[in-house]
Amino acid sequence: MPGKILLLNGPNLNMLGKREPDIYGHDTLEDVVALATAEAAKHGLEVEALQSNHEGELIDALHNARGTHIGCVINPGGLTHTSVALLDAVKASELPTVEVHISNPHAREEFRHHSYISLAAVSVIAGAGIQGYRFAVDILANLKK
């Protein structure tokens, strides 16, 4: 049975390709999932993807992945800057976690410069567009070796 990576996308990421394309580009969430899935397959891994606009669903997914997945790729969206509960869930999952941001939050508004999630992440990738998801999967695959 191949290892699984949990791919979590937070609030508003279902709007990729439609919302602020000058910041986030024209790629869709489906493109993100396809890219991550293809990269995982190169390493003999599978991806379980979830996008939710509800913090509790993301937390539940992290809890449920504990002990069953090899790692997590997460783009928490706006929860990055506000959610201690999501940080605690990342820690509780005990999964190596890579935080991904399509844009560079440090080149944007001041409130976006802080990430709670990065306190528990093994790596943070920002500003690489959706390629950041591919890089994140590669990082987790190499940690597994």
From Swiss-Prot:
A GO BP annotation: aromatic amino acid family biosynthetic process
EC identifiers of the protein: 4.2.1.10
Recorded superkingdom: Bacteria
Keywords: Amino-acid biosynthesis, Aromatic amino acid biosynthesis, Lyase
Pathway of action: Metabolic intermediate biosynthesis; chorismate biosynthesis; chorismate from D-erythrose 4-phosphate and phosphoenolpyruvate: step 3/7
Active-site residue list: 24 (proton acceptor), 101 (proton donor)
Molecular function (Gene Ontology), one example: 3-dehydroquinate dehydratase activity
Keyword Amino-acid biosynthesis: yes
Keyword Methyltransferase in annotation: no
Family per similarity comment: Belongs to the type-II 3-dehydroquinase family.
Function summary: Catalyzes a trans-dehydration via an enolate intermediate.
UniProt-listed PANTHER family: CATABOLIC 3-DEHYDROQUINASE
NCBIfam families attached to this UniProt entry: aroQ (TIGR01088), PRK05395.1-2 (NF003805), PRK05395.1-3 (NF003806), PRK05395.1-4 (NF003807)
Protein name: 3-dehydroquinate dehydratase
Organism encoding this protein: Corynebacterium glutamicum (strain ATCC 13032 / DSM 20300 / JCM 1318 / BCRC 11384 / CCUG 27702 / LMG 3730 / NBRC 12168 / NCIMB 10025 / NRRL B-2784 / 534)
